[in-house]
Amino acid sequence: MTIYHFVGIKGSGMSALAQILHDKGFQVQGSDVDKYFFTQKALEEKQIPIMTFSADNIQEGLTIIAGNAFPDTHEEIERALELGLSVIRYHKFLGQLIDGYTSIAITGSHGKTSTTGLLSHVVGAIRPTSYLIGDGTGSGTKDAEYFALEACEYQRHFLAYKPTYAIMTNIDWDHPDYFKSVDDVFNAFETLGKQVKKAVFALGDDAELRKLTLDIPIIYFGFGEENEFQAKNVIKETTGTKFDVYHREEFLSSFEIPAYGDHNVLNALSVIALCDYEGLPVEDVKNELKTFEGVKRRFSITEKGNQVLVDDYAHHPSEIRATVNAARQKYPDKKVVAVFQPHTFTRTRTFLQGFADSLNLADEVYLCDIFGSAREKTGNLTIADLAHKTKGNHIIKEEHTEELLKYPEAVILFMGAGDVQKFQAAYEKVLDHEFLTEADLKKSAIN
């Protein structure tokens, strides 16, 4: 029996794909760096072996699935090629895997992971569904009819897919190390659209997506009157958001989600539209929307005393803006403190003023050093260039997170696509020490 070996198994997509193959009964293993990543927890729970990168890991009989971050010169891939083993890139393997299902590719500059998670939750509760989510979660469900997958636009990798449906959440200029302009991004999305078999669900409030020209139906959703599926009468509460949905100006139903911000209404609306198109019962869809608990690293809340710590993947000005607004909806009486770690020097340089403008929507801003991606380790700017444009000109270090104790009633947003979680972990240790010290003082006073 073939053993699938994943080169870079801790990558979010790779981890999810490994879990899918494991669930389908295949033997799976993989390798990566020794550093801990949140994606490996699910792998460990399923007892999928994780090794440290080494050419010695590559033996006869393996089929190699290579992560897109690793070139053919990587020691394990080189050894595999020397042995004449089959080496296939992640996105190409996934493109082959989804054939035979009613596949739904969820793409967009922002909101892919949250929407894929929501769709998987809703459709999966109604019909057997396999799914691959960009937070490292994957499931190869037995006898699945549907396959929901997050489709990343970077380097046009999503062009390896020919899905039944696509959901396009928005188009924005991101990944400036690859895409040269928003027009370049649009061209990639339109090319994907031409590969979709049945229909594309697209945000009609997005000027770029309105330019799509395809031979299949484009079902537009959004807040605007011109959309086929429209969200109206939005009520924002501290417990979530309620809204009505109209289909071609006819009332469909009222919905409720335990999530915050306009972006989450739109994510839910895309799922509602697809489910309606597929004839899934609206009452079932309503019930499942109410129970979605979110995906990893997307507004993930930890309460510590009177402080609320939020872990979020936001790494683009538009995403930061959405996260700050969501925090203000859920916690209207709390101060919002942003702790942000920029991801890649190219993105930071390109959107420097945009980052400053969105971060300054928070009450206080703290910046971590720029996180260089695997493709880009250094740059000719520093975090000070961004700090000069933000409130307070604060730069925070992992070993000095106690500065955040100054905001005892605040919501603290730890945002970034790198390893900003280590700053939150360091601060939680500070808080735990503070709570212990306070408890000791009270105990001494009683005695």
Curated annotation (Swiss-Prot):
Top-rank taxon, per record: Bacteria
Family matches, as SUPFAM superfamilies: MurCD N-terminal domain, MurD-like peptide ligases, catalytic domain, MurD-like peptide ligases, peptide-binding domain
Top-level class of the enzyme under EC nomenclature: ligase
Family matches, as InterPro entries: Mur-like_cat_sf, Mur_ligase_C, Mur_ligase_C_dom_sf, Mur_ligase_cen, Mur_ligase_N, MurCDEF_pg_biosynth, UDP-N-AcMur_Ala_ligase_MurC
Catalytic activity, reaction form: UDP-N-acetyl-alpha-D-muramate + L-alanine + ATP = UDP-N-acetyl-alpha-D-muramoyl-L-alanine + ADP + phosphate + H(+)
Matches recorded under NCBIfam families: murC
Protein name in UniProt: UDP-N-acetylmuramate--L-alanine ligase
Species of origin: Listeria monocytogenes serovar 1/2a (strain ATCC BAA-679 / EGD-e)
